[in-house]
Amino acid sequence: MDSKKKSSAEAEGSKERGLVHVWQAGSFSLTPERLPGWGGKTVLQAALGVKHGVLLTEDGEVYSFGTLPWKSEAAEICPSSPLLESALVGHHVVTVATGSFHSGAVTESGVVYMWGENAAGQCAVANQQYVSEPSPVSISDSETSPLLAVRILQLACGEEHTLALSISREIWAWGTGCQLGLITTTFPVTKPQKVEHLAGRVVLQVACGAFHSLALVQCLPPQDLKPVPERCNQCSQLLITMTDKEDHVIISDSHCCPLGVTLSESQAEKHASTVTSPHPETLDGQGEVFENTVAEAELNMGSDQTTSGSAISAQQNIVGMAEVSSARTAPSYPDTQTVTAYLQKLSEHSVKENHEREEKLPQVQPLVEEAVPDLHSPPTTSTSALNSLVVSCASAVGVRVAATYEAGALSLKKVMNFYSTAPCEPGAPSGTASTGPESLKDLREEQVKQESLQGKKSSSLMDIREEESEGGSRRLSLPGLLSQVSPRLLRKAARVKTRTVVLTPTYSGEADALLPSLRTEVWTWGKGKEGQLGHGDVLPRLQPLCVKCLDGKEVIHLEAGGSHSLALTAKSQVYSWGSNTFGQLGHSEFPTTVPRLSKVSSESGVWSVAAGHGYSLFLVDTEDFQPGLYYSGRQDRAEGDTLPENPSGTTTPVLLSCSKLGYISRVTAGKDSYLALVDKNIMGYIASLHELATTERRFYSKLSEIKSQILRPLLSLEHLGTVTTVQLLQEVASRFSKLCYLIGQHGASLSSYLQGMKEARNLVIMKHSSLFLDSYTEYCTSVSNFLVMGGSQLLAKPAIDFLNKNQELLQDLSEVNDENTQLMEILNALFFLPIRRLHNYAKVLLKLATCFEVTSPEYQKLQDSSSCYESLALHLGKKRKEAEYTLSFWKTFPGKMTDSLRKPERRLLCESSNRALSLQHAGRFSVNWFILFNDALVHAQFSTHHVFPLATLWAEPLSEETGGVNGLKITTPEEQFTLISSTPQEKTKWLRAISQAVDQALRGTSDFPLYGGSSTVQRQEPPISRSAKYTFYKDTRLKDATYDGRWLSGKPHGRGVLKWPDGKVYSGTFRNGLEDGYGEYRIPNKALNKEDHYVGHWKEGKMCGQGVYSYASGEVFEGCFQDNMRHGHGLLRSGKLTSSSPSMFIGQWVMDKKAGYGVFDDITRGEKYMGMWQDDACQGNGVVVTQFGLYYEGNFHLNKMMGNGVLLSEDDTIYEGEFSDDWTLCGKGTLTMPNGDYIEGYFSGEWGSGIKITGTYFKPSLYESDKDRPKAFRKLGNLAVAADEKWRAVFDECWRQLGCESPGQGEVWKAWDNIAVALTTNRRQHKDSPEILSRSQTQTLESLEYIPQHVGAFSVEKYDDIKKYLIKACDTPLHPLGRLVETLVAVYRMTYVGVGANRRLLQEAVKEIKSYLKRIFQLVRFLFPELPEEGSTVPLSAPLPTGRRSFCTGKSDSRSESPEPGYVVTSSGLLLPVLLPRLYPPLFMLYALDNDREEDIYWECVLRLNKQPDIALLGFLGVQRKFWPATLSILGESKKVLPSTKDACFASAVECLQQISTTFTPSDKLKVIQQTFEEISQSVLASLQEDFLWSMDDLFPVFLYVVLRARIRNLGSEVHLIEDLMDPYLQHGEQGIMFTTLKACYYQIQREKLN
């Protein structure tokens, strides 16, 4: 607040604002009085009741004055000076309100305080006559849980009620009477209740008369309109009524709820249709009881009138008042033209009918006098009721229409009789009506006229046809009884030739949030005896009802007097309705029950209003911007008046003399007095604000006039010109409408601003200047585009005729004074007229700035804003000149080229017609014309031309050595040429022009000045690297392809998307114009109606590196590419399991063909081939296994088994010899039976289908050892591919990634550089993929970016560092080593899973792992040269920990008998922990299959022996008794071992050994075995209580017991895996002996027999 005061003081001097002047109502005293006893505090707001008033000061204090009977102390009842309401001190009140005898205030925290008379509960206090001091009112929303206090924004008070508007824009009411809008019969209402009928709508303002209420509500956006229910939500009556007549059916959809609930236009949206039904539908309710019994008496309803559907409809409309919806679509009639023609005949016939019926309807005079509205209002209640009585739904041809017409006439006669009982409106003269039939005819014509005007009501304010002209009163010459036919059909026929132009919706987001909405509705409720509700009748309403005729009138403020209402519009007009006894409505037209324009001043617009008891005040704009005050209403009785009971009033509003007072900012009206708040004009600040507000409101009126009188009629013409012309003009009109709406909103906000604190920093034009600057810029752009394309010269003859007829109007509106000016120039001046307003803004803001100190922030902001508007005005002026320059250029340009080059947004910058620029090396007679537009450089030659878009154009000056002084090099994606200028100055001019144009084209904007910044800051040179879109036309590979992405010096470079016309698309990175890096490529396959899809790496425009290619046929290849071909290691999946030939190949490719080692899985045949390939065929050594257990290894030729081979069947039958085809024996060989018998000789035939043998049968001697039997078994693997030859491509690829052409040949530093690059590149690519890296993965990648550095001698610590690095590297496929391991795991699983899970392949699988270890170890030693070779020893930096007990001696001794000299470096020790866990499942499965038979024997013995208790088993196994545990410690308790005890002895050792199955590597498994031995020693030591020495004879039975109790299912597989993969140096050490013991136990268990 301090800063606010300071700013105000600087601008104004001191305390010269908010002065209070009071007039007596009706006295017209020339000089108003200053409020008695009032000091000098600035008053922001005042409110007046019948005999009292309140003032709100700038510092948030409230003062009461007048008669205050509710005060407790006598001195305060009639205070001599305004009395401070001490109860409100410190609460900072922001708004006040008064009713007739009570007051209210709202604090800045949204709390309401009430005081004064409370007989009707209007102060929200129960059972209390008066509330002497302001007391807070509790308002809480019961719908929320817990109850939330409702914050209030505004307050309005009537005589017996109060309304509050909450911050969520809902109305809360309390007090007494129907004016509360609450559904209740219990009064008074002392607890504030929500007015539910308006819940969900945005209420902008509330106002209270004595006994009626008004609300200003924001219109619903179109999408918020909801579909219709079948019945009314409030009274449960049908929304569409149907009455079955003798020959037709009458349907009415104009339901109006008796509670005063009207339907929204869309809710009445039901098509009228022909219905023929023998059973008439009737409504339930015959009427509703009002709280006001007088209203019920006035209705005077007879029972006979409520029997027919038409009468029911009429009754409902009398009670509830609704209008036939005008937003409905026309029903689908069979033949609209027939109906239209028929209607014409019908209209001629009905004129005669009218004359014949003249005598029959003499009683309608009062009705017509009340109901005829002026042209501007939609139909009133009576007309609406009449119209909806008889809506015929005949099929609209022939007899049906005639029948409807006749029956309708009878219905209408009934209605007339019904209406004649309604009372005449009070105050309406009775002798001025014309004769009945003529009046009725006028009424029906008016109705049809209104229906057609409201025709297709758009919810957008920008519908050009929506706002009717406010002037003339033409009427259509259609007969009255045409209402028999559906009014929709009439509307449709009336607007057949009208162009529908719906322009930009006015919901502009930001502007609507910051400025008051003009899309408003007025809702009224309460008592309506004087017509103050505006519904065309005098009936009360229990609930809010929309005053439809104010829709689209842009009402921005409401005021309610004692029994009349005022609505102020954005166009500075006032609509008034209600009691006009004293002329308080400002006009003398009837009826006064509907809103009509007040005739305040023909020249001045009204910007503020106040309504008192019997009078109104209008604050108007004057020529010198000082507000003038008009008074309209009651006058006090003059001296000697003999008729005091007939008080007089004004016939027209009277201007009060108040110019000497100062600038009135607000007027307030009470009963007998009214007051004005006045500001003195110190330093011109107030005058400048009023000038801004007045000119803005006048500007809006001017724009509205242009829209309604020029644009709307122009756009509604049938033939405007070409499609382009219409589009351009519609764009102009749309932007114009948007600007117009913004100006209207701003004018309304300025009116509110003048009534407030008037702080400079809160001016919308300064605070949110971008709203205005953008709107003006958009509008100017659309007008300039229209002008460039020829402007008004494009318009067709009907448009030109219209403009010629209205030339005087055009001249007047465009402010062109010269009568000789051409029509086109006038139209251009009119379109550019709004731009002038920017200069006015700049001027007024500058004026305001001078009222402040130069150092103040206000001065700076106002100065900056003024500069913004001025610079934009100059800029838009420049844009207009550019448009005119471009237009004149097109007029001289050759016609054919104009059509192709002329575009609305294209502007000419410069051209070389004066030969200032020429093409280097051009022919002697060639003509080269260069034209620079804002979006392209055009090179024209004779009749041809070429367009170079600026976004993809690079210009640079040539150096003197290469091209002379005046050369300019122009580079485009497909052209490169040199331009020579005539002089160095010309060269500089062209270079600057081209560079500036390119820069603007790239930024996507013209050279608009930066808002709030300098407009001179220009980038001199456009960037060499940029984003742009281009379509190639020349390049053979890229012809007609479109590229959108990054460029560098004329070539695609960086990320981009390239699309070919045939549907091919590449999306990825480019380098020097070619695909290079990572990208995605799609190629449509029209034959299969699918597409090929490649995602992966590219090099120089070709697929190169890792990628995935998905073929349209369903095949998928994942692997390496080179020159668009599969080359290197890859996986090809063909088909799926459900398809005809599913298969999978993984292996090496050369030039798009399988070559080298690969594995082929033929899923259909159940065979897997593992061997060599050449030219897509199996060639060389290989192995085949089948799902039936057959195993073949040998030679292949052209996909067939050919040459030497070995074949094994599942039952161990072996053939070793020659083959000629798949599974076909042919030649010399040996067949060995499972029992060892064998046949040597010649074999021919297919295996499994009979083999022809010529040879010798051998039966081995019984004395031959078993070892000699399976000779072939020992030969297995000799004809398979050597392990080191497998997957060479995988390892070669890894070496290549490290920068080595062959294994081990390369620089280490270069390898590490490549690793860093790979990690960075892969991470960047991974960011674009949908998979998100976890935090741990990200940390792993970050740690891998550090290269391990090793200086000095190699140690165990360095060895551990390398081990840790390898574990991390192999964990991420983004690292070359990680990718290698991932690929090896994939190929290993692919080989040995499924059909490959064959026990014959175990040795191959083991060899393969050993080969992996050897080859990876070579890679690791290359990266870490200091790592010793295989089998070397690393000295220990610290001695072995002392105190470890040797299991052999059982003693604790620091001196080991065979101390390890150091740590042995082996490939398996380093790499198996990384590799084996990943390969373990398939490998262990092979071990299990291979040891299947002996495992079964072992397991059977284990299960059998484990049935015995511990003591029995120990005895059976021969364990010495001294080692038997006597007692056991279980959960801390010592328990004796009983004969029945089971699974208790050596339990810790058993548990330890069971963990062998959870480990992967042999070293880990050996550690488990070692730990088990130690646990056994500990257990024995605990029972013996003394040192002892193990001997193998003692140890073996105990360990055997532990192995049995451990119950390891696949112990044989575990033993064999350790044996195959353990480091050789461990075999003779301690762990080797322990392992041998375990192996002995395994074989011993198989031979144990239980006695």
From Swiss-Prot:
Residue ranges, annotated region (Disordered): 444-476
RCC1 repeats (start-end): 59-108, 109-167, 169-218, 519-570, 572-621
Source domain of life: Eukaryota
Annotated ranges, domain VPS9: 1507-1651
Domain called PH: residue spans: 895-1001
DH domain residues: 684-879
Disulfide bonding pattern of the chain: none
Modified residues (Phosphothreonine): T504
Name by which UniProt lists this protein: Alsin
Species in which this protein is naturally found: Rattus norvegicus (Rat)
Taxonomic lineage of the native organism: Eukaryota, Metazoa, Chordata, Craniata, Vertebrata
Gene name, Swiss-Prot/TrEMBL: Als2
